[in-house]
Amino acid sequence: MLKVNEYFDGNVKSIGFEQKGDKATVGVMEAGHYQFNTAAPERMTVVKGALTIQLADEDEWHTYEQGQSFDVAGHSSFKLEVKTPTAYLCEFLD
């Protein structure tokens, strides 16, 4: 079953799905600044575009481009700066 999610007044949209017990979402973020909280550990992969992120326990910002991934701890948060519309895959690691 697919689950459609919408955040930040429609500027971030994703479709959640499950495959062989693994949960993931694929989505698109419009240009903007966002902050997400995590319940479980996540791996974010940039499909097209770029995401500049700051993890909750870090001072520095890092940019990830097409094909690159970063992990976010569970019960944490991360900030994003998106300069152009960007597609992503979010895999839940629990």
Swiss-Prot record:
Recorded hits in Pfam families, A to Z, give: Ppnp
UniProt KW keywords = Glycosyltransferase, Transferase
- EC number annotated for this UniProt entry: 2.4.2.1, 2.4.2.2
Per the record, its GO cellular-component terms are: cytosol
Does the keyword section mention Cell cycle? no
Q: Which InterPro entries match?
A: Ppnp, RmlC-like_jellyroll, RmlC_Cupin_sf
Highest taxon of the lineage = Bacteria
- Reaction it catalyzes: a purine D-ribonucleoside + phosphate = a purine nucleobase + alpha-D-ribose 1-phosphate; adenosine + phosphate = alpha-D-ribose 1-phosphate + adenine; cytidine + phosphate = cytosine + alpha-D-ribose 1-phosphate; guanosine + phosphate = alpha-D-ribose 1-phosphate + guanine
Provide any one GO MF term from the record. thymidine phosphorylase activity
What top-tier enzyme class does this entry carry?
transferase
Please describe what this protein does: Catalyzes the phosphorolysis of diverse nucleosides, yielding D-ribose 1-phosphate and the respective free bases. Can use uridine, adenosine, guanosine, cytidine, thymidine, inosine and xanthosine as substrates. Also catalyzes the reverse reactions.
The UniProt entry's sequence similarity note says:
Belongs to the nucleoside phosphorylase PpnP family.
- Quote the PANTHER family the UniProt record gives: PYRIMIDINE/PURINE NUCLEOSIDE PHOSPHORYLASE, PYRIMIDINE_PURINE NUCLEOSIDE PHOSPHORYLASE
Name of the molecule in the record: Pyrimidine/purine nucleoside phosphorylase
- Organism in which the protein naturally occurs: Aeromonas hydrophila subsp. hydrophila (strain ATCC 7966 / DSM 30187 / BCRC 13018 / CCUG 14551 / JCM 1027 / KCTC 2358 / NCIMB 9240 / NCTC 8049)
